[in-house]
């Protein structure tokens, strides 16, 4: 837009063109996915996050955000009753976690890490250099997901150019992806 608009016009457009077609995740009768910012605390947290929104991708870019992520990761580990080896504050510094903006972002990051780890392991085993390993092995990698997995699994495989095999799970086994299913 080259010229500003009156706020009433902006809100009218928002009401007519956005709100009419939106799925209202905050509606008390919406059970399709997961709760959103429906509480006072959630709204306040969103407001504070928006006020300090900056690229928190590493400590140099945003020390406060990175340190806060470490504190929150420890809180979650403690709330889940995980051993201290999972804590960022553990002296060995082997613990920790990351906070992502979405399931898709976390799935993609996990798959990239798994892909790179697999390619490195192949290089170690075969003695091939990294470029040869990528050329030879990248198209052979397969990502496995259960038929109950989040849609971000298939999306991630497509983004990374990986084969994706969807494997069945059953209620009988509490929808767990089992070793015998993977071996087939």
Where are these regions (language model features)?
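N-terminal entrance/gating region of PLP-dependent enzymes' catalytic architecture
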Residues: 1-94
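Hydrophobic alpha-helical scaffolding
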Residues: 4, 34, 62, 100, ...
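Secondary-structure capping and boundary motifs in well-ordered enzyme cores
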Residues: 40, 64-65, 99-106, 145, ...
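Glycine- and acidic
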Residues: 52-60, 86-98, 135-140, 163-171
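C-terminal structured subdomain/cap of oxidoreductase catalytic cores
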Residues: 66, 70, 74, 111, ...
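Conserved beta-loop-alpha segment that forms the PLP phosphate-binding cup at the N-terminus of a helix
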Residues: 69, 73, 89-137, 152-156
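PLP-dependent aminotransferase-class I/II
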Residues: 117, 121-127, 131-184
């Amino acid at each position: 837009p080259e010229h500003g608009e009156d706020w009433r016009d902006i809100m009218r457009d928002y009401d007519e063109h956005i709100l009419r077609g939106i799925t209202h995740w905050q509606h008390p009768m919406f059970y399709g996915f997961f709760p959103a910012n429906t509480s006072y605390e959630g709204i306040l947290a969103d407001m504070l996050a928006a006020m300090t929104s900056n690229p928190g991708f590493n400590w140099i870019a945003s020390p406060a955000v990175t340190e806060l992520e470490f504190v929150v990761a420890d809180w979650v580990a403690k709330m889940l009753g995980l051993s201290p080896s999972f804590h960022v504050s553990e002296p060995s510094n082997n613990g920790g976690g990351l906070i992502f903006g979405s399931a898709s972002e976390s799935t993609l990051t996990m798959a990239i890490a798994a892909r790179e780890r697999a390619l490195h392991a192949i290089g170690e085993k075969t003695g091939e250099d990294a470029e040869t390993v990528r050329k030879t092995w990248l198209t052979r990698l397969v990502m496995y997901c259960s038929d109950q997995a989040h849609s971000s699994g298939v999306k991630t495989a497509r983004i990374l150019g990986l084969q994706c095999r969807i494997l069945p799970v059953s209620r009988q086994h509490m929808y767990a992806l089992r070793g015998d299913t993977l071996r087939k």
